Amino acid sequence: MGAALAASAGHSALAQGAKIKAVAFDAYGTLFDVYSVGQLAEKLFPGQGNAISQLWRTKQIEYTWLRAMSGQYRTFWEVTEDGLVFTAQRLGLDLTDDKKRALMEQYNKLDPFPENLEVLKQLKGMGVRMAILSNGNPPMLEAAVKSARMEGLFEALLSVDSVKSFKTVPEVYRFGPDHFKLSAPEIVFVSSNGWDAAGATWFGYTTFWVNRAGNPTEVLGVRPVAEGKTLTDLVEFVKARM
């Protein structure tokens, strides 16, 4: 698809035609590369770096869903650590306290995707209001934003921690309209996670799916309003709707 944007069928006319006034970004996988932790994992466990990063992310997300459905909240930091412990057990790795600490600390300084900083600066220069809306708890988000040199670009770091649940619970998505004092269709919700884009679309956002991996759309009876391959494609989408 490249820079061409796919406006999808099956959305409300309001979401399709709304003037965009703000953007809410998912953090992990969208702004920050969760698989970049695999580089350190490879050094600590040679030959296992990719497997660790893949399974760790899978369990991290699975645990947020299970805890949200069951009302058993733990912070995203704790859930991330639990996912790492499971991953080590599943792969038969000796996860010492020092290695666990090193990998967890790396999660606070994940690599940003290469185009992201320039895109964020472009949007800010266009007068677009921006915030992060994430499963991450506040200390994690603050550390990641600082490490990625994104400080000063966002009005707010909106965390699920205040409602003690996780995406795709509707209460989480309500943070965007509540913060910006805008209707959901006036806000572009940006995520690289197809399930997150689906949840935000159900809520009523104008959704933009950053489909970096070229995955098919989740089969949930709903599609994101638009799709691009990188965050660079978002700029064109927002410009056309301001």
What is the predicted role of each segment?
Residues 1-25:
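Non-catalytic pre-domain segments flanking phosphatase-related domains
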Residues 77-78, 95-132, 142:
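Short, acidic loop-to-helix structural element flanking the phosphoryl-transfer center
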